[in-house]
A protein has these predicted regions:
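Conserved beta/loop motifs at nucleotide-recognition and modification sites
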Residues: 1-177
């Protein structure tokens, strides 16, 4: 992130499309890591854990070989309000050298968790818009794409994707293979 932008202690990324949400998490983590070595800064908490204790433990661990830590916990939507309580308690007084990236995925996010993140951080809505906003969303993604499409090709691609616009990144990656 640029020095002008604040780095929050916590981010919650949520969205209905798994691919779009994953892309948003990847972009956010890259922004948070900046020029640092991701292997020294980023810790992915195993999604198989049945509790959020591993995420809380990782978030409470100070950085060792870097100035900051970025802890990513995916699938936090599968936990109940009671199960999320330790994470909510951590967010009341987060470690200043850690940024916690929580990824919704699966289930309803506990309201207390969403509110705790809002108090100290930022909620990222990673959904795909509808109508005209969807066209603008696609145009933005195509502008940053590794291939250039004219307006007619972009319209055909949009029609082909329909409601599954989360596949856009994969299709653009495949197009590079065939060039």
């Amino acid at each position: 992130m640029s020095t002008a932008e604040a780095v929050f202690p916590a981010y919650l990324v949520r969205g209905d499309d798994a691919t779009v949400t994953s892309d948003a998490v990847k972009a956010l983590v890259a922004e948070l890591v900046g020029d640092a070595d991701p292997s020294l800064v980023v810790e992915e908490v195993a999604q198989e854990d049945d509790t959020l204790a591993a995420a809380v433990d990782a978030a409470q661990t100070p950085p060792f070989f870097a100035d900051r830590r970025v802890v990513v916990a995916r699938g936090v939507g599968r936990f109940t309000t009671q199960e999320a309580a330790p994470l909510v308690a951590y967010l009341a007084d987060p470690l200043p050298t850690t940024t916690l990236v929580l990824v919704g995925g699966g289930g309803q996010l506990p309201r207390a968790l969403v509110e705790a993140v809002r108090r100290v951080g930022h909620v990222v809505e990673a959904g795909v818009p509808t109508g005209r906003a969807r066209s603008a969303w696609m145009a933005t993604r195509l502008k940053d794409a590794p291939v250039r499409l004219d307006a007619q090709a972009a319209a055909l691609l949009g029609a082909h994707l329909g409601d599954e616009v989360g596949r856009l990144g994969s299709l653009l990656d495949l197009s590079l293979i065939h060039i």
